[in-house]
Amino acid sequence: MSRDDQLFTLWGKLNDRQKDNFLKWMKAFDVEKTYQKTSGDIFNDDFFDIFGDRLITHHFSSTQALTKTLFEHAFNDSLNESGVISSLAESRTNPGHDITIDSIKVALKTEAAKNISKSYIHVSKWMELGKGEWILELLLERFLEHLENYERIFTLRYFKISEYKFSYQLVEIPKSLLLEAKNAKLEIMSGSKQSPKPGYGYVLDENENKKFSLYFDGGAERKLQIKHLNLEHCIVHGVWDFILPPP
């Protein structure tokens, strides 16, 4: 039975409500959209089409950005469907890589804040810092050890431009850039009322300009954030732009 025959047969089995939902879902693929491959060595043209279709399928039933877990699965499925060998890490609480692509361990991040910057990346939770000693030098060492668990890092950034217009951006954060944190200038925020007191690790270029900051958050989660990471130091692999029709 051909694909068209299968669709016709299935259509006849749906009730009116299911047919209405099916039509809405099909119309999702007819939205105004642009998929741009801008750089990179892993992804082929098929991946950008497949992943873009998965993004629009998600937004057929949700007004929220793709969560990290949904990103991981959509990313992995799109890679495999496009002919790239990929598999998710077996443990979802793995303190390192999230996915393996052609035998390369990769960490995945997402960013979807309402006030997201076009020029600077912010990762609100890079890793948990645990309940050990709160000494910035030791925390920095833990971050550098964490980097040993993966070779590449990709973050999916979501921009809501208007009620019906949104965009996704796939960016690679070079591991070599993050490794520059070994020379970070550490500063404890002594005036903070938080306990333990938070601190910063500033990564500067040769002209003392800030490349990015490590923020050791001493709050309830005790986590490491990456702040003010200039997009100019990263690789934008692709952009997906969508304009949805009004309901």
Swiss-Prot record:
It holds the Pfam family SmaI. This is Type II restriction enzyme SmaI. Its EC number is 3.1.21.4. GO terms for molecular function: type II site-specific deoxyribonuclease activity. It is an enzyme of class 3 (hydrolase). InterPro entries: SmaI (IPR049519). GO terms for biological process: DNA restriction-modification system. The gene is smaIR.
